[in-house]
Each structure stands twice: as structure tokens, then as C-alpha cells.
Design a protein with these regions (language model features):
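Beta-rich carbohydrate-recognition and catalytic domains
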Residues: 1-211
Length: 211
């Protein structure tokens, strides 16, 4: 159900949500601010080019698995844009049709935009590749750390992003180490990621994540 709140805010109310809401993207459209609104201080806007006159492709926007109702906020004056008719609820997302020129040999995410590799480590007989990643389009934005693993550096398993854009800002480049001697106190063999969070509001902040 769509609820208009003034000229520039639309609330999407979803009952018994599926795994995803598939958002239609138009490359030439201006960005809208889209947020999963659960009333938490950690709720974060994502900049997404929602389709206005045509759909170039869809991207999945993850919904919480255990919620009975969900609200997604869209901050932008979109009027009767095409996106409202083309949004879809789904438990699956098949990216196989999104890129006819997808590389076969070189690593590439299943969908979205990627840039430089970050935090390359080897742990428990697996190579971990983290990289600059925007899961909501094919242009720069919404910086996450994408995450893939491999045993031979040729065949890759794509995992959920390791670090997602948050209220501190975009997740910019950094490095990772495997703390084999528990020097930092987060556990023997913990992976420590050091990176820069960046936003207009907060500037650049040096951050640490671990797992």
C-alpha cells in the first residue's frame, strides 16, 4: 500500500513481507532516498535511481525476515512515475539476465557496480575478497564492502556484503588482517577490517569492523 506524505515523501507499507522488494531502476533518473524504516537510529538512506519513464533492470532491496509489517520510505517527488507500478515483492532474485557481457574469467559481483579490491586475506583454506560495491545500481554510490570467497582464486562464491553503508557514511577503502594471536582481543583468528566511513555530514572517520 502506498501512502503519500506531502509532495516528496511516499511510504510503502508491506504486510507479511517477502524476502525482497524488487526496485525498478532507470539509469538516467535522478536519485531518490530509499530507507527501510524500522524506527531504529541505524536506519540509513540509500540513493537509488527509481524508474520514472522506463525500466532498465531491477535490484533487490532486502526486507526483514521476521517482521509482520514493513515500511519503506521513498524521499523524492516522483508523482506518477513508472516505479510505483513496476515494484515487485519476491522471495528470490535471479541476476542471470542482468548483464549479457558479464566476464567469465575475472571476478564480478552478481549484479551492481564494483571497484577496487579491499582487505584481501586468506583464512581457513579460503581466500576472502572484499571490494567497493554498490548493490543498487551500475554507477558509483552507496559504498558497501562486497564479499566473495574462493578456494582457488578462479571459482567464486558470492556472499552478502560484509559491511554496508550506515549512518556514519559510505564504506570507503581499507585493509584487513587475520588476528591469529588475538592481539586486538576480538578472538583468535578474527578478521579485522580497517576502513574509512565518509559522508557530507560526518566527514571522514576511521573505523574498525571485526568478525
Amino acid at each position: 500500500m502506498l501512502e503519500q506524505k506531502g509532495d516528496s515523501l511516499t511510504l510503502i507499507h508491506i504486510t507479511n513481507p517477502t524476502n525482497y522488494i524488487l526496485l525498478p531502476i532507470e539509469e538516467a533518473a535522478e536519485e531518490s532516498r530509499v530507507r527501510l524504516d524500522i524506527g531504529d537510529a541505524a536506519d540509513t538512506d540509500m540513493d537509488i535511481r527509481l524508474a520514472q519513464t522506463k525500466v532498465d533492470y531491477w535490484v533487490p532491496f532486502v526486507l526483514p525476515a521476521d517482521a509482520k509489517t514493513v515500511t519503506v520510505r521513498v524521499q523524492k517527488s516522483l508523482g506518477d512515475a513508472l516505479c510505483w507500478k513496476e515494484m515487485k515483492l519476491s522471495d528470490t532474485f535471479d541476476p542471470s539476465h542482468t548483464d549479457k557481457f558479464r566476464p567469465v574469467y575475472h571476478h564480478a559481483p552478481l549484479y551492481g557496480w564494483m571497484n577496487n579490491a579491499n582487505g584481501l586475506v586468506y583464512e581457513d583454506e579460503e581466500y576472502h575478497l572484499y571490494y567497493q560495491y554498490n548493490p543498487y545500481g551500475s554507477k558509483w554510490g552507496n559504498m558497501h564492502w562486497g564479499h566473495s570467497i574462493s578456494k582457488d582464486l578462479m571459482h567464486w562464491e558470492h556472499l552478502a556484503p560484509a559491511i554496508v553503508r550506515d549512518t556514519l557514511g559510505h564504506i570507503f577503502s581499507g585493509s584487513s588482517i587475520v588476528d591469529q594471536e588475538n592481539v586486538a582481543g576480538y578472538g583468535t583468528g578474527a578478521i579485522l577490517a580497517f576502513y574509512t566511513s565518509a559522508s557530507d555530514k560526518n566527514g571522514q572517520i576511521q573505523c574498525l569492523a571485526y568478525s
